[in-house]
Amino acid sequence: LPRQPVVFRREQREQAATDSVAHLLDGATGIWFGGGDQARLTAVLRGTATERAIHRRYAVGAVVGGTSAGAAVMSALMITGDERRPGGERRDTTTAYMTIARDNIVTDSGFALLGGAIVDQHFLRRKRHNRLISLVLERVPHLGVGIDESTALIVASDGQWRVNGASAAVTHNAKSARVRG
C-alpha cells in the first residue's frame, strides 16, 4: 500500500518530544534526513520520543538514510562541521582542515545508527581527508567513512557496505595507528 510521507520541520523540538509526532513513524518502512545543519538536527531530535521511534523502526528493518547533514547524523560520534582554531581565530574556508592536528575537529553525539564508524560527507568534492584523518586518529572507533556528493553508502542488514552513485566513499582506518607527540 502506498504511504503518505510525514514531513517534520527540524526546528520544532517541542513537537519531536511528543508521542503524537513519534507515532507518525509507526509502520514507517523508510526514514530520510535531508541536508542542512547536522548539529541543529541532533539538537532538535536527540533524546526525544521521535528519536526513540526512529531507533525502534530501524531495529525492525526500516531503511534510514540521509544526505549531507542527514548522513553525518548516522554515526555515534558526529562531525559538526566546525573547526577549532588557535587563539579563537576565525575559520578561513580556503585553508580549513589543511593540516592533520589534534583536537581541531568539533564533534557532538549523532544518532548512532551506523555503528563502528564516523561519517563525513561531501568528502572528495570538499577535500575533507585531513578532517576525517584527524578525528579517526584521536577518537574511537578509529574508523571513518567519507561519502562524496551524489554517492550513497548502503549498509545491509548483515553490516556489509556497498557504494552506489556518481563518485566514491573512502575509508580511513586508524585502529592500529600509533600517534606520537
Task: For the regions a language model picked out, list residue spans one by one.
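Catalytic-core regions built around general acid/base machinery
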Residues: L24-G27, G47-G61
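C-terminal and late-domain segments of enzyme folds
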Residues: L1, M78-T80, R84-G181
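Catalytic nucleophile loop
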Residues: W32-G35, Y58-M78
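Glycine/threonine-rich flexible loop motifs
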Residues: Q38-G47
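N-terminal beta1-alpha1 cap of cysteine-dependent amidohydrolase-like domains
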Residues: L1-G35
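Short, active-site-adjacent cap segments at secondary-structure transitions
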Residues: Q38-A39, A71-M74, A152-I154
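Glycine/Thr-rich phosphate-binding loops of Rossmann-like dinucleotide-binding domains
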Residues: L41, S75, D82
